[in-house]
């Protein structure tokens, strides 16, 4: 079992280590869900939630595929998850059942991108689900969300391990982005300096040609 978990973690680690752009988190979310299910943990879907200043960006994937990147406001349940993370929680288990679950889906269906998918789900399933469990696992830049339709206490530590792996690789990704940005700024400065030097060396207006 431990070997299987390590292999699943390594697949997610390798994929996120190879990221060149944050949009690739779409594919990574699908892989994350795939690897968790391969361990026998029945998930309905997995998401990466990365904090912004006043809202978060999410990438969601499940067995059916991935969604385009979407943002979620810092209100309602999202505000609650954010605040619990800021208060030092490492894992939050949130159950939705009955009318509360339907109300949660009704709210989610008002959001861009994911809302369109949920409206289709409502039609094809003759209504929204009446039970689900959110497993929110925090890391430095946000949290991972694992959605299940049943209690999976044996998976909690596995979820936490996935979050730790993702924090390491996402930190590396941010470092690479920062280094690339600095390199671009240096190139721009060099180009500007060449133009500046040439302009300073001009003696007549004909040299503008």
Predicted feature descriptions by range:
Residues 104-143, 151:
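Helix-to-coil/beta transition segments that act as allosteric "coupling" elements at the rims
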Residues 18-68, 201-209:
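Helix-loop-beta substructure at the N-terminus of cytosolic sensory domains
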Residues 151-172, 181:
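Amphipathic alpha-helical "output/dimerization" segments
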Residues 53, 61, 65, 124-125, ...:
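Surface-exposed receptor/substrate recognition regions of extracellular proteins
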Residues 38-45, 91, 168, 172-179, ...:
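Intrinsically disordered or highly flexible coil/loop and linker segments, enriched in small
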Residues 47-110:
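GAF sensory/regulatory domain recognition
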Residues 1-19, 25-27, 172-208:
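Signal-transmission linkers at sensory-effector interfaces
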Residues 30-34, 128-132, 145-146, 150-157:
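A cross-kingdom feature marking solvent-exposed beta-strand/loop segments within repeated
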């Amino acid at each position: 079992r431990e070997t299987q978990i390590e292999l699943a973690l390594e697949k997610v680690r390798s994929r996120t280590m190879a990221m060149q752009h944050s949009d690739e988190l779409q594919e990574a979310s699908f892989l994350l869900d795939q690897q968790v299910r391969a361990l026998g943990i029945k998930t309905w879907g997995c998401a990466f939630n990365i904090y912004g200043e006043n809202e978060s960006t999410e990438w969601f994937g499940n067995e059916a595929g991935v969604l385009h990147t979407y943002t979620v406001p810092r209100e309602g349940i999202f505000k609650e998850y954010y605040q619990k993370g800021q208060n030092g929680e490492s894992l939050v288990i949130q159950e939705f059942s009955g009318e509360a679950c339907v109300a949660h889906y009704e709210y989610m269906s008002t959001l861009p991108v994911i809302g369109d998918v949920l409206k289709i789900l409502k039609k094809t399933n003759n209504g929204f689900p009446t039970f689900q469990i959110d497993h929110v696992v925090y890391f430095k830049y946000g949290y991972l969300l694992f959605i299940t339709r049943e209690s999976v206490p044996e998976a909690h530590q596995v979820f936490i391990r996935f979050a730790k792996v993702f924090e390491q690789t996402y930190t590396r990704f941010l470092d690479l982005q920062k280094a690339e940005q600095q390199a671009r700024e240096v190139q721009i400065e060099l180009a500007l300096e060449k133009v500046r030097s040439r302009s300073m060396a001009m003696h007549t207006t004909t040299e503008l040609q």
